[in-house]
Amino acid sequence: CMEALEEAGFIDAVKENGFQEKFGAKFVKNGKICDYFFADQFTPGWSWTWQVPRGEFDKTLADTCEIMGIPVSYETTVTGIEFTGTDSVTTVEDNDGNKSQIEARFIVDGSGYGRVIPRLFNMDKPSNLPPRKAFFTHVVDTKRTMDDEPNRITIIVHQKGIWIWVIPFSNGNTSVGFVGEPTFFKSTAGSTPEEQLRDLLASEPYLAERTKDVEFIFEPRVLESYSVSTTKFYGDGFVLTGNVTEFLDPVFSSGVTLATVSSQTAAHLVIKTLQGEQVDWEKEYTEIMMQGVNTFRSYVMAWYEGTLDTIFFADNQVPEIKSMICSVLAGYVWDTNNPYVKDHSTALIKLEKMIKARDALTK
């Protein structure tokens, strides 16, 4: 995603915010640690990115767009779109009820969970991933230094199919959230969302002391059954980008990668279209984006099934293989020179079997 931000002219503006730099990811399970550093990855590319409060990050991008001369409207709802061939008229309404219309030769729908075009034109399609729930907040992380690497993003395996994200920000706050099957959260004690999340945090040995009595910046929020797809990624006069196409899961930051790369790819094709050039949207857009989506999907499924647990926490790991998997975690899911991208649907399963067979022989 850093290449996309760089090409769009956002890098300097984001740097000025002083966001926490991210050099990899740390996975923890029952006290055992697996570390991935992006500098060790198989695919040539960026060795770092950022850990960001999304509100501040998104506002930085929007402000930079305005500086570039792009108008941005806030608190405005799209209520309808009419297409005439590839031309369109979009009706919008602000918070005061004022309506206006926007004429366009082409629409790029990057509305995220809003899913404007899919909802207006009945294009939503269920994901093939099971429904899951995320329960999270931001905390004032006063005891962060209890961790030996206090500024590292950490993913904790709480139990099979249930994991925790810990994302420290440069402002001293930390995002922390539990993710898993909705039934897991029904057994949580507490009569309020805050009590429920505090109970969950207290049940995780890796976080219990660090998060005890910390201040919650906002009442814990829920995202549920968030995995969703669409019947098509493009049509006459429009293209869908980011979460509007398909959102898989918060793990591995796949949403940010797919959002930035899909926007970058779509922008190039929209420019070609507006210049009168022929574009094969299926081949040049959908097939490319599905390569990334399907690679991430294989890793998301392997994560919840426990396959990645076996791989991440194995003894005597092969550095070359670890670097290939690291590239996927860094977002390079289009590099088919990487066997763990090219053969994503089978490579992880084969590796898991090899590790289990080796471990059985050494017992």
Q: Where do the protein language model's features map onto the residues?
A:
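FAD/FMN-dependent oxidoreductases across multiple families
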Residues: 186-270, 275-286, 291
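A short, glycine/Asx- and small/polar-enriched loop/turn
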Residues: 23, 30-31, 82-89, 234-236
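C-terminal helical "tail/cap" subdomain of flavin- and related membrane-associated enzymes
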Residues: 268-363
